[in-house]
Curated annotation (Swiss-Prot):
Organism of derivation: Haemophilus influenzae (strain ATCC 51907 / DSM 11121 / KW20 / Rd)
EC number: 3.1.3.45
Protein name: 3-deoxy-D-manno-octulosonate 8-phosphate phosphatase KdsC
Further facts: Cobalt was used in the crystallography experiment but magnesium is likely to be the physiological metal.
Annotated function: Catalyzes the hydrolysis of 3-deoxy-D-manno-octulosonate 8-phosphate (KDO 8-P) to 3-deoxy-D-manno-octulosonate (KDO) and inorganic phosphate.
Keyword Amino-acid biosynthesis: no
Family annotation (InterPro entries): CMP-NeuNAc_synthase, HAD-like_sf, HAD-SF_hydro_IIIA, HAD_sf, KdsC_fam
Gene3D superfamilies, sorted: HAD superfamily/HAD-like
The family this protein is said to belong to: Belongs to the KdsC family.
Catalytic activity: 3-deoxy-alpha-D-manno-2-octulosonate-8-phosphate + H2O = 3-deoxy-alpha-D-manno-oct-2-ulosonate + phosphate
Length: 180
């Protein structure tokens, strides 16, 4: 696993069940409300500060998700896309990386083709067993509770870039221009 982590230059993440806890709440106008964990936002920003590109690939599209993507400065994304294998290959092409340089993090059946398309795969702790059986690494953190951050720390540690998250200077650099 260490060798795989050292080679990662691109991370593709699912949203519902990974960056959120997977629950959908609706306001009085019928608009979906989601919550995102601040640690995951920091993990995304830290990867980008360490020259590791991050993309979002979601089966859903919503104004709140587009806002989160914009807030984090993510440039590559596909929203409302359930066929994730082709989407992963398209994102890799846009990022200029190979499958071996790409990691994917997901939580459910819809992510199985993406796991197969990418060189390294992660599942959140609360993913179903058949999803856990399909990935390279099962995280100890649940989706929406900092699972992305757990993965990003692993990648940065493996690449000798842990100063991005384990020093005050690295942390301050990452949050300087971000609303988390």
């Amino acid at each position: 696993m260490q060798q795989k982590l050292e080679n990662i230059k691109f991370v593709i993440t699912d949203v519902d069940g990974v960056l959120t806890d997977g629950q959908l709440h609706y306001d009085a106008n019928g608009e979906a409300i989601k919550s995102f964990h601040v640690r995951d936002g920091l993990g995304i920003k830290m990867l980008m500060d360490a020259d590791i590109q991050v993309a979002v690939l979601s089966g859903r599209d919503s104004p709140i998700l587009r806002r989160r993507i914009a807030d984090l400065g993510i440039k590559l994304f596909f929203l409302g896309k359930l066929e994730k294998e082709t989407a992963c290959f398209d994102l890799m092409k846009q990022a200029g990386v190979t499958a071996e340089q790409t990691a994917y993090i997901g939580d459910d059946s819809v992510d199985l083709p993406a796991f197969a398309a990418c060189g390294t795969s992660f599942a959140v702790a609360d993913a179903p067993i058949y999803v856990k059986n399909a990935v390279d690494h099962v995280l100890s953190t649940h989706g929406g509770k900092g699972a992305f951050r757990e993965m990003s720390d692993m990648i940065l540690q493996a690449q000798g870039k842990s100063s991005v998250f384990d020093t005050a200077q690295g942390f301050l650099k990452s949050v300087k221009s971000m609303g988390q």
